[in-house]
Amino acid sequence: MPPSTGSVPPAASTPAAGDEATAAGRVLLGRYELGGLLGRGASAKVYLARDLLTGRDVAIKSFPNPRHGGGLRGGEEDVLLRPAPIEREAAILPRLRHRHVMRLREILATRKKVHFVLDLAAGGELFSLLDASGRMTEDLARHYFRQLISAVRYCHSRGVYHRDIKPENLLLDDAGDLKVADFGLGAVADGALHHTLCGTPAYVAPEILSRKGYNPAKVDIWSCGVVLFVLAAGYLPFNDASLVNMYRKIYAGKFRCPAWFSPELRCLVRRILDPNPATRIDTEEIITHPWFRQDASHFAMAQLMQHGHDEEAKFKTEFKEDDMARDMTAFDILACSPGSDLSGLFGAEPGKERVFVGEPAAAVLSRVEEAGKKEGYMVTREGKKGTGPVYVKGENGGIVAKVCVFKIADAVSVVEVVKGYGAEAARFWKARLEPAMKPPAAI
């Protein structure tokens, strides 16, 4: 049987006075009614909650606010010395919008707590689907492995690496689809090899053990291979009562496939659990492997692996002025509040620029449209009251930028620019969009 996923059943909790994140029935910041405790980790607790505005059940992950000196693992000194899970997830989750990645809906904060509002994994853990023998059929394992690789491939395309893929972090929504959760050990691409010792022992890649630096994409692929093996075999590929011996097996890539594995599955597992990261298969090779593509039409595979609609979903969220006001309260106004200083914790949101202007929205958006058309891009304006958003799309249909203007006061508006990914979007911002934020007399 696979190892226990360590889930924690709902439990009663005796809150400290004034701690709204620990008492069932309390309402968090006027919107979320807290329910039972779903689980806890080294740095956070997760609660069931109900959104009083929509009636939707959500999960709320609550952390001590480091700015209040709440301490994460070892106290305030440790928080200052290394990025805490809250900082990692706050940097990573806003980048991600994919059907198989747990969605961050909102970040809220009080003086003592920071709360992530997440989709609820109503279907429980992936490993709850294992049969009496402790494993899945090969077809069912393939179904969920496809969803896992779709999520991992997407994250890597966004420069995000999980580094702790394991059963506890593979959840199911109410439709039974996979959701990859918990990016507390995640990393963002910086062009360098990583040296941090991350991961869970049985799922850790051999190059991490060498402490010589590693490619986090290949580390994630290795962990996906261990998950696939466990789903189809019902036990770990590298297991030993002695942790040292288990590490030796991992480092040597020493394992045996069970007799019921098909030849194609054996081949794929051996390519993934290759102890040499240089020759280990990557996600592009995985999605073309015969076992992975078996019984799937070209169209179905393209639908599973395409990122375009996810990027569109991320950028084409319905924006209303009152929604923007609520978002700015959570991320900006609150961050500047003396009582809840989060500015040093979250920093700038990745890929997003905000510029304050003293002119009507229509004038700014007209300059944005002109800048896009000068580059030969497709430009469309949506929304009401001339506030946009304006979408600027490149030759391949990918979004280069989304620009929206929100009125703050009679003579003040804020222009929010969400930049696309890659060098093209960065160049367009610097060469065209940033200058377009200034009125003509100031250019």
UniProtKB/Swiss-Prot annotation:
Catalytic activity entry: L-seryl-[protein] + ATP = O-phospho-L-seryl-[protein] + ADP + H(+); L-threonyl-[protein] + ATP = O-phospho-L-threonyl-[protein] + ADP + H(+)
Keyword check for Membrane: no
Recorded GO MF terms: ATP binding; protein serine kinase activity; protein serine/threonine kinase activity
Region spans: PPI: 350-379
EC number: 2.7.11.1
Inducing or repressing factors: By drought and salt stresses and abscisic acid (ABA).
Positions of disulphide bridges: none
Protein name per the record: CBL-interacting protein kinase 29
